[in-house]
């Protein structure tokens, strides 16, 4: 239990998720490195290393999977309402970490393979989005999406790169995020039919997928379209050539893995999954097309539902601002911390 608590705090799982959006002060390349591939993945890496030892226990399954599911839903929902580009990406990271945690919590070898695959895919599309956000901040002077409108006419090439990366984050077909997300959907369907979980897990997974599409659409539409810029500190323009190279490389990986997953990530995924499972690999397929399956239907429903959520976002913003938007986990944490210090001072004075 103590190890699992360490994992949850390190990888920003609910209710310890609130620190991650406030840890964005580093320069853009550092943020991209820390928040897509290294620091926040340390907790789920520990889950992966402990998977062969602990995954058979019922406590692991229920605690890890339910925490991952709560984090997946909360992060996806909250990301839609963040006005700061990095804030949106931070909460989307929380959601994807919840997805990975949920897969490890399910406890089957195939779920672990899907988790490892999504760790790799998330690192590529999220790093490219953080780099794109840094370019936008550098050239426009702000990350506020209420001001960043209509940048397509000023930065069309950057917009195309960001749109591909956001599509991968949303799980659009022929991009890498679609493949690992479909594997995730497939596992939820399997559990609903074979393990007696019934309908609620696939429903929750599809709902999270809808919000992922919605916040990805907001990243694209609010920044590059949606009217004209509003009082930008600088006149935006395309960045210097070498500033775009890291984003280009990562976006090419998103495309290449989405189209040719077995050729590009196949050997690396097999090696990483074998190291995680500490044994033989289960049968799995990295094909782009598996036919008309329930997982594909969930993916298409998530895309359609996400577009619908984004189309009716204004009433949702109003409801959010009057309800859950008022809750601040960081404020609760600081109050608890202050209470601990006051209690320690009282005990010290008595002694």
Predicted regions and their residues:
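Membrane-embedded and interfacial regions of multi-pass energy-transducing membrane proteins
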Residues: 75, 226, 230-242, 256-275
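Hydrophobic alpha-helical membrane-embedded segments
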Residues: 126, 210-217, 258, 299-319
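Alpha-helical transmembrane spans of integral membrane proteins, capturing the lipid-embedded, hydrophobic core
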Residues: 41, 123, 251, 255, ...
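Hydrophobic transmembrane alpha-helices and their helix-loop junctions in integral membrane proteins
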Residues: 1-239
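Membrane-helix interface motif
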Residues: 172-189, 259-278
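Aromatic-capped, Gly/Pro-kinked transmembrane alpha-helices
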Residues: 263-301, 308-351
């Amino acid at each position: 239990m103590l190890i699992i608590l360490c994992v949850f705090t390190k990888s920003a799982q609910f209710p310890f998720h609130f620190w991650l959006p406030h840890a964005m002060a580093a320069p853009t390349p550092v943020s991209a490195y820390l928040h897509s591939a290294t620091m926040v993945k340390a907790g789920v890496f520990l889950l992966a290393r402990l998977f062969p030892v602990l995954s058979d226990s019922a406590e692991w399954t229920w605690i890890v999977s339910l925490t991952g599911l709560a984090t997946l839903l909360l992060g996806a929902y909250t990301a839609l309402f963040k006005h700061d580009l990095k804030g949106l990406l931070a909460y989307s990271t929380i959601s994807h970490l919840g997805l990975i945690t949920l897969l490890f919590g399910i406890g089957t070898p195939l779920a672990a393979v899907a988790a490892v695959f999504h760790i790799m895919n998330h690192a590529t599309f999220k790093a490219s989005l953080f780099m794109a956000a840094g370019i936008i901040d550098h050239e426009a002077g702000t990350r506020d999406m209420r001001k960043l409108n209509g940048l397509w006419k000023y930065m069309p090439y950057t917009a195309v790169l960001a749109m591909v990366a956001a599509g991968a984050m949303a799980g659009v077909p022929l991009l890498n995020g679609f493949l690992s997300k479909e594997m995730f959907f497939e596992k939820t369907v399997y559990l609903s039919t074979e393990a007696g979980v019934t309908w609620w897990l696939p429903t929750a997974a599809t709902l999270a997928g809808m919000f992922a599409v919605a916040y990805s659409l907001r990243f694209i539409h609010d920044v590059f379209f949606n009217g004209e810029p509003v009082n930008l500190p600088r006149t935006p323009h395309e960045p210097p050539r070498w500033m775009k190279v890291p984003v280009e490389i990562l976006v090419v990986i998103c495309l290449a893995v989405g189209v040719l997953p077995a050729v590009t990530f196949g050997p690396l995924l097999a090696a990483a999954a074998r190291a995680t499972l500490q044994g033989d690999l289960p049968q799995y397929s990295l094909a782009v097309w598996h036919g008309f399956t329930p997982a594909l239907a969930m993916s298409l429903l998530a895309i359609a539902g996400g577009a619908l959520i984004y189309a009716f976002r204004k009433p949702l913003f109003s409801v959010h601002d009057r309800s859950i938007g008022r809750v601040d986990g960081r404020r609760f944490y600081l109050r608890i911390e202050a209470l601990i210090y006051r209690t320690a001072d009282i005990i010290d004075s008595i002694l």
